[in-house]
Amino acid sequence: MNIILFIILSSIIGYFIGSISFSRILLKIKAPSKSLDDLQLKLDNSEDEVKVMMGAGANKASIILGTKWGIIIGILDMIKVIIPLIIFRYFLFPNEAYFLYVAAFGLIGHNWPIYYRFKGGRGHSVMLGSLIVIDWLAVVINVILGNLLGFALIGSLVFASYLWLWMMIPWFLLRYFNINFIIYAILVNIIAILSQIPEIKLYVKLRKEGKDREYKEKLTKMTAQFRGLQKMEDFFKSLGIWRIVLGIISLIFTIVIYTFAALFNL
């Protein structure tokens, strides 16, 4: 009974802390006349504006406030989960997995915050902040290898953006073989997919109208993160056949690293 009670309490605490939206708080301070929910993008040869579907997080806030404030918001989003995770993992319950529930529900709160009519961000900063506490080595290895595999082997910006997160499932399975870690990794991936549904629906609609390419190009120019990812994609494409070679090497290296993680508790 105590276990269930602590799981519920950990989840509630994580959710309410995660629901704090620094993007909305700072936007209200710096640009009170602006709204993250009403951001529009004007397409060429079209009288209508398209609503920008990026959630209400650091990336979208950076379009209005600038890159510097976008970075600050991203850091604050990381800190808001890092602090309670450290408290739960290392001080309150060092031998229990309650911190994983704080992390998972912190992400749910960030993406669907109760304070803001369940309109939140997409949780990239929250996921990174949580994983730094849960397994910092997983962040370093999977972000690097995920980007290399996504850009070099698959040649896709979308895969590169999310592959590192998908890789957390086999990583936790091989390294810990603990049901709590595995459930956390699966749940985080499900949350990430569900939070992208508005973007997916918009992309399908724009693709039917033949406006998807222009929307992507204009949206990419609006944020430093997207511009950086686009530059990385262009760089890897410029490598030609060497991109595939680098991708295969990255895949082999990934298999070796994961094998070491499983056999020697890396």
Segment roles from a protein language model:
Residues 240-262:
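Final/C-terminal transmembrane alpha-helix of multipass membrane proteins
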Residues 2-34, 254-258:
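N-terminal signal-anchor transmembrane alpha helix
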Residues 1-13, 85-101, 132-139, 172-184, ...:
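Helix-coil boundary and interhelical linker segments in multi-pass alpha-helical membrane proteins
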Residues 140, 144, 157-165, 175-190:
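Loop-to-transmembrane alpha-helix initiation sites
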Residues 62-65, 88-91, 124-154, 166-175:
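Interfacial segments of multi-pass membrane proteins
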Residues 10, 14-15, 19, 23, ...:
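Alpha-helical transmembrane segments in multi-pass membrane proteins
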Residues 52-89:
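Multi-pass membrane catalytic core of lipid/isoprenoid biosynthesis enzymes
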Residues 25-67, 204-237:
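Cytosolic, membrane-interface loops and tails of multi-pass inner-membrane proteins
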